[in-house]
Every structure is written in C-alpha cells, then in structure tokens.
Amino acid sequence: MPANPFAPNSQAGKVAVVTGASSGIGRATVQQLTATGWNVYALARRAERLAILEAETGAHPVTCDVTDEAAVRAAAKNILAETGGRVNALVNIAGGAIGLDRVADGSPEDYLAMYRVNVLGILNTGRAFIPALRASGEGSILNLTSTAAEGGYEGGAGYNAAKFGARGLTEALRLEEADNNLRVIEIRPGMVHTEEFSLNR
C-alpha cells in the first residue's frame, strides 16, 4: 500500500495549499498539517479569519475566492514565486450548500453558485497548481466531496448535483494524472456540524 502522503512526520517541510481554510474542515486541516510539519498556504475569502489562523498555526494567509479564476491564478503565481515553484499537495475543501428548495422551486442562481464553488473551484485550483504538482514527482490532490455525491435527498438537488459533479471531476482527474505520479484522493464525509454548513443549510 502506498505511503500516506499526509502522515505525521513523513512530509515535514513540504508545501500544501488548502482552500476553504478560514473555518470548519478547512481550518482543522490547516491546523493538522502545520502541526505535522507542512508549510501551508491557507486560501479563503475572509482575510480577518486567515489572520487569526496565521497567528495560531504559522500558515501563510492567502485571501482568494476559488470561484474567481483570475484570482486563483494570481494567488498561485505568488505562492509558486515564494516556494520556488514547489507545491506537493493541493487540498480542496472549499464548498457549500444553499437552501433546501425542491426541484420544482429551485433557484437557478443558487444552483449555479453551488456549482461554482463545489466544482469550478476544484477546476480553477487544479489548472493553477497541477503543473507544479506534476513537477514535484509525487504530488497529491485531495478533493472533499460529500455523501451527497452518492445519492439524492429531498430538498438537496442543487447540492447533490454539485457534489456529483465534484465526484465525477475527481474520478476523471485521477485517471488522467495516473501516469504523472500524481495521486488524486476523494473524501466523502457525511454531515459534519460546522458553522458554514449550518449557515448555508
């Protein structure tokens, strides 16, 4: 079995980029990675929360909206300039759900917003960092999806559709990058009590 790329003490000093880092699972991921020796760049929209995270963990704060392709590319350019082009792991945690509307009452705007953050966010960061991850010779991408990517539920069609999309993108990416020694991992958690999920749902 291949070694766990995120195991404690096995990757000290390597560079990770974590999205959705200002709260919830993303914040906890930054805390765990920095505690085990990773050099972490923490991406999120809320600069004030990133500043607190920096003080607590030493992570590098990067204010960025993953749905904004130009902003992601600019952030990646700055990160790669600081690291000498080196990134070993991309951890895509940014995501979210909006509302509980049934399909008959669904808001196209809400559906698009969920698709942008849950699917296009992964696309944007992937396009920005995959060349550096390939160059590392042992890069890893971890995409957080959801058990909502396994089956529909009432009032969740927009979120289901977005997470199914993220799952499909991840599975295709895994096949596409296999020959580049780029590991692509998907984690599908069930319901997690976080501030953001409570606000969105």
Regions found by a protein language model. Give the residues of each.
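The beta1-alpha1 cofactor-binding region of Rossmann-like NAD(H)/NADP(H)-dependent oxidoreductases
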Residues: 64-75, 108
